[in-house]
Curated annotation (Swiss-Prot):
GO terms for cellular component: nuclear envelope; nuclear membrane. This is BRO1 domain-containing protein BROX. It is a lipid-anchor. One of its GO terms (biological process) is mitotic nuclear membrane reassembly. Belongs to the BROX family. A lipid is attached at C408 (S-farnesyl cysteine). Farnesylation is required for nuclear envelope localization. Nuclear envelope-associated factor that is involved in the nuclear envelope ruptures during interphase (NERDI) repair. Residues 409-411 form a propeptide. The modification Cysteine methyl ester is found at C408.
Length: 411
């Protein structure tokens, strides 16, 4: 499913040296600083490494976060702030608002910002995997799992760590509730797309497919309503994507609901449902063009050129023609003026985020190691010195080249 998913850019960050000269007064403390520097650099490299997989990402995130938590969590399990939490300044850009960075001298800001990028990596990994020419069933499961993991990371950051920030989150930026909610729900919607493709491939009950498509359309509508409250300059392209996906899955829902009605000998209602499917499919086609022409951050999906998209149009037309033929020969039922109300609830296949937890603090941290950081040795005028601004360069991301499209490949 090459270019089926819209992706915003990764967050970029300024280099961090963790050079606490004089403060890191023991060999163990200096080793912590060195390991923080190297594990952070390694994790940032993997974000743009096309060969990176789940295992590599987990190992890298565990290595860095298990060290970083020694700057945040209390070693004795208490609630008192760790003395090292505010020792280092961190700068991060935003996925939507370009290269103007936000900066906070707070290790929690680093934790949630890097964690946000980890979640984004899982979404991009899923998109890249779904774009393979001959995706296997196991790879399709990996796409599904990656999106659920990403949703779990976003949810965990929002509920457990972002509230701990001392500096309030700026409105419309990544860590704000509306933005992180939009990312979370989009991950759930995209994972359900994989479920729908699988259900179609295995020819499951049309009622189940209609219900799943309806739930997925509602997810995309929820994302769109959330984005509508943000600055349109930054989210116009993202909104076009969510709107076209909403219309596409509403078309799917009405199409398969029409099949269910036909099997229950309600041919007139089936025709009306298929007419509604045709209307939503037409809207989705128009929105595909609008999306492609809308400027904004992120990669551009190309769903209208995808066989999965085109198959839907053919299915709607063929099913509608079949219903009309059957009605002319057998049923002779009136077609209702109003489209049927979809009150569909999927009992199977709904996606929930995979619960996420940061790793435990590394055993390198001990009371002795912690004591090895002597904050009294910090230069007294440290904060008053004019510092050279570190440039925050955009994160390099691998190109995803379209491959031969052989249809509904994620199933």
């Amino acid at each position: 499913m090459t270019h089926w998913f819209h992706r915003n850019p990764l967050k970029a960050t300024a280099p961090v040296s963790f050079n606490f000269y004089g403060v890191a007064s023991t060999q163990a403390a200096s080793k912590i600083c060195s390991d923080l520097r190297s594990t952070r650099a390694r994790l940032l490299e993997l974000f743009s490494d096309i060969t990176c997989n789940h295992e590599m990402m987990k190992n890298a995130t565990d290595a860095y976060f298990s060290l970083l938590l020694g700057f945040i969590d209390s070693l004795d399990g208490g609630t008192q702030d760790n003395k090292l939490r505010y020792i280092q300044n961190f700068k991060w850009t935003d996925t939507l608002q370009g290269n103007a960075p936000s900066a906070q001298q707070d290790a929690v800001f680093e934790l949630v910002s890097m964690g946000f990028n980890v979640a984004l990596w899982y979404t991009k990994y899923a998109s890249r995997l779904a774009g393979k020419e001959d995706i296997t069933e196991e790879e399709a499961k990996e796409v599904h799992r990656s999106l659920k993991i990403a949703a779990g990371v976003f949810k965990h950051l929002k509920e457990n760590h972002i509230p701990k920030l001392i500096t309030p989150v700026e409105k419309g930026r990544d860590l704000e509730t509306r933005v992180i909610d939009a990312y979370t729900v989009q991950c759930q919607a995209e994972a359900q797309e994989v479920t729908i493709a699988r259900a179609i491939e295995l020819k499951h009950n049309p009622g189940l497919i209609a219900a799943l498509a309806y739930e997925t359309a509602n997810y995309y509508q929820k994302v769109d309503h959330t984005l509508a409250t943000l600055d349109p300059v930054y989210i116009a392209k993202w909104r076009s994507y969510t709107q076209l996906k909403m219309c596409f899955y509403m078309a799917y829902s009405y199409c398969y609901h029409g099949q269910t009605l036909l099997s229950a000998d309600k041919c007139g209602e089936a025709i009306r449902s298929l007419q509604e499917a045709e209307k939503f499919y037409g809207k989705a086609e128009a929105l595909c063009k609008e999306y492609g022409e809308t400027k904004g951050p992120g990669t551009t999906a190309k769903p209208s050129g995808h066989l999965f998209f085109r198959k839907m149009g053919t299915l709607v037309r063929n099913t509608l023609e079949k219903c009309q033929r059957e009605n002319g020969f057998i049923y002779f039922q009136k077609v209702p003026p109003e489209a049927p109300q979809l009150e569909l609830k999927a009992n199977y296949g709904l996606v929930e985020p995979v619960p996420f937890e940061f790793p435990a603090m590394t055993s390198q941290w001990s009371p002795e190691t912690h004591t090895g950081f002597d904050l009294t040795k910090r230069p007294k005028d440290d904060s008053a010195k004019p510092k050279k601004e570190e440039e925050v360069k955009p994160m390099k991301e691998p190109d995803i080249k379209p491959q031969k499209d052989s249809g509904c490949q994620i199933s």
